[in-house]
């Protein structure tokens, strides 16, 4: 089931999620898919981790020696990401930024989007986001996009393969669009519908796209 939003969730909604507890996308570790991407040579710097949340991917890649900036729309997420990095002894960088107006310097060779794209519910929002990414990346840069699939069971907002291809039709080449999994933690919003106890770790159907900037 695809969850269609009338508009992008507000900064306050995301900030409240980080203030009130642990959102379902906060799993206390990097997504296994992103870890594997790095191991197989899919990452080169400089790297932008967009919608970084508590910064697990930024912290991982920084610790491995990459030049990385993690950005999030929610100030509370960035605050908690910085604290997370300090606790792990990693000198990682984070900034508050709007995904529709991403920093364009130094011109990123790799962008990691783990579960951000799928929150945009309208074509116009997705087009604006793709344009922002295009400005932020250098020519021939690569976007790795991990999004919940419409083949899933309603764990969160989801998209189809066609939506991904349409959003990146102009100025991009979709080099790969593979089935994958996205790890999350069942919270009160989904426990009843999924028939699972809160706190259950789930690996949900997802898309992993490799998209090259022209």
Each model region followed by its residue ranges:
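Conserved SAM-binding loop
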Residues: 81-82
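Conserved SAM/SAH-binding beta-strand->alpha-helix loop
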Residues: 74-76
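Conserved SAM-binding strand-loop segment of SAM-dependent methyltransferases
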Residues: 88-99
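Conserved beta-strand signature within the Rossmann-like core of class I S-adenosyl-L-methionine
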Residues: 140-147
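A short SAM/SAH-binding and catalytic strip from SAM-dependent methyltransferases
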Residues: 109-124
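A short glycine-rich, Lys/Arg-flanked "PGG" loop and its adjoining helix->strand segment in the class I
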Residues: 127-139
């Amino acid at each position: 089931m695809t969850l269609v939003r009338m508009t992008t969730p507000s900064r306050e909604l995301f900030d409240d999620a980080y203030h009130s507890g642990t959102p379902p996308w906060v799993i206390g570790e990097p997504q296994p898919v992103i870890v594997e991407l790095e191991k197989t040579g899919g990452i080169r710097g400089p790297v932008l981790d967009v919608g970084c949340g508590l910064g697990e991917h930024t912290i991982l890649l920084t610790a491995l020696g990459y030049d990385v900036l993690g950005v999030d729309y929610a100030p509370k997420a960035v605050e908690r990401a910085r604290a997370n990095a300090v606790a792990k002894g990693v000198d990682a960088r984070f900034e508050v930024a709007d995904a529709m107006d991403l920093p364009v310097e130094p011109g990123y060779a790799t962008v990691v989007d783990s579960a951000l794209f799928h929150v945009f519910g309208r074509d116009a929002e997705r087009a604006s986001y793709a344009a922002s990414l295009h400005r932020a990346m250098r020519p021939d840069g690569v976007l790795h996009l991990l999004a919940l699939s419409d083949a899933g069971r309603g764990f969160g907002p989801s998209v189809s393969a066609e939506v991904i291809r349409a959003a990146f039709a102009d100025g991009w080449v979709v080099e790969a669009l593979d089935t994958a999994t996205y790890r999350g933690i069942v919270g009160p919003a989904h426990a009843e519908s999924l028939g699972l106890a809160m706190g259950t770790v789930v690996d949900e159907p997802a898309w992993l796209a490799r998209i090259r900037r022209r």
